[in-house]
């Protein structure tokens, strides 16, 4: 049984991803690192290769309560471009499950149009892509089923809140 799924796309931000995974596991929850590529090994924006726990097709979406998206460039655009993931994000939204994202990644939710009517935050300069009701400069914003965070420097606070 999986509590959360965090997705690795080529070019993800490794500190954001690993901080979230580490803190969630320290809290005693099950989080799976899921590759959206055809291999478990995924390389970050800073050329660090990490082995995911599962491929996308193996992820346990039924038991997962939360989707988490780490930021990074080109990781964030790669997440948005992966239709199987965006379909699952829309399904989670419809079913009232939790959606969470750090740094530039909240813009994935924004570009899917699901942040409308919600408050959110993201990496400074990316807010034009949030398409939300209200952009906040807080380190972490929780609004309904969404938790968003500004970036790498806010990850410890983010994981304690999420």
What residue ranges belong to the model's regions?
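Catalytic nucleophile loop
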Residues: 67-71, 89-115, 120
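A short, Lys/Arg-enriched amphipathic alpha-helix followed by its capping loop at the start of a domain
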Residues: 20-29
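Flexible gly/pro-rich beta->alpha loop and the following alpha-helix that scaffold active-site loops
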Residues: 32, 36-96
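Extreme N-terminal starter segment of soluble prokaryotic enzymes
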Residues: 1-5
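Phosphate-binding/catalytic loops
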Residues: 98, 140-152
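Short N-terminal binding/cap micro-motifs at the start of the first secondary-structure element
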Residues: 12-17
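Conserved small/polar residues in nucleotide/adenosyl-binding loops
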Residues: 158-162
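A conserved active-site-flanking secondary-structure segment within enzyme catalytic domains
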Residues: 115-140
């Amino acid at each position: 049984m999986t509590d959360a799924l965090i997705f690795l796309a080529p070019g993800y931000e490794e500190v954001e991803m690993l901080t979230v995974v580490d803190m969630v596991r320290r809290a005693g929850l099950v989080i799976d690192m899921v590759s959206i590529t055809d291999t478990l090994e995924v390389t970050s924006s800073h050329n660090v290769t990490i082995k995911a726990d599962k491929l996308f097709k193996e992820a346990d979406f039924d038991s997962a309560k939360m989707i988490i998206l780490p930021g990074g460039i080109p990781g964030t655009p790669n997440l948005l471009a992966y239709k199987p993931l965006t379909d699952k994000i829309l399904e989670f939204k419809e079913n009232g499950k939790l959606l969470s994202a750090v740094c530039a990644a909240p813009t994935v939710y924004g570009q899917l149009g699901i942040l409308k009517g919600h408050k959110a935050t993201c990496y400074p300069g990316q807010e034009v892509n949030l398409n939300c009701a209200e952009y906040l400069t807080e380190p972490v914003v929780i609004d309904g089923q969404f938790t968003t965070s500004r970036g790498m420097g806010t990850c410890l606070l983010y994981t304690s809140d999420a």
